[in-house]
Amino acid sequence: MAEPLVSETLWRRVEPLLPKPKVRNRHRQYAGRKPSHPRKILRGIVFALRTGVPWEYLPATSEWPSGQTCLRWLRRWQRAGVWKRLLVELLSELARPGKIGWERAIVDSASVRVPHGGRNTGPSPVDRRKRGSKHHVLVDAQGVPLELVLTAANRNDITPLLGLVDALPALPGKRGRPRKRPDRVQGDRGYDSERHRQELKKGSSPS
């Protein structure tokens, strides 16, 4: 049997983080369809992100609403901080027993083509100037993703580095105060900058 797109475990994680729906006035008549259940919306979001199907080509089915509806709720939940809180919860569960590799963090980026453009897109210098975005990711020593920033594809790798490190959440550990800085930050030549090195030394040692 195929693994469900939204398992019970995932849904139990996400549901408490979703904004509470507004209570409708029972004396007012509402036209149109009944709102989709949030779990169905999440199922459509996960399907689109896993397959890469454009939102406008994702049809409404018995499993999820239309792609445009899923995209609208994805953005709404993003603005509400749902995904950030989910990440912090998961990282905290790893940090409490000491499973976050704070001895070093590795930063890197990858460009992704975005044919239709939009926010955080720009001409890619590595893809014949086609429009795209760049994903900047910071992971711990074991490859656990700690933070991610999205920029236009024509932004330099090092531009969001300080913001990426500063955005790390304070995570509880086995003892002492919560921690949010790795001992060392490592990157390739694209991150070689004396100014950034000095800034990072205030809280961690770059390589």
Predicted regions and their residues:
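Short alpha-helical elements
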Residues: 1-207
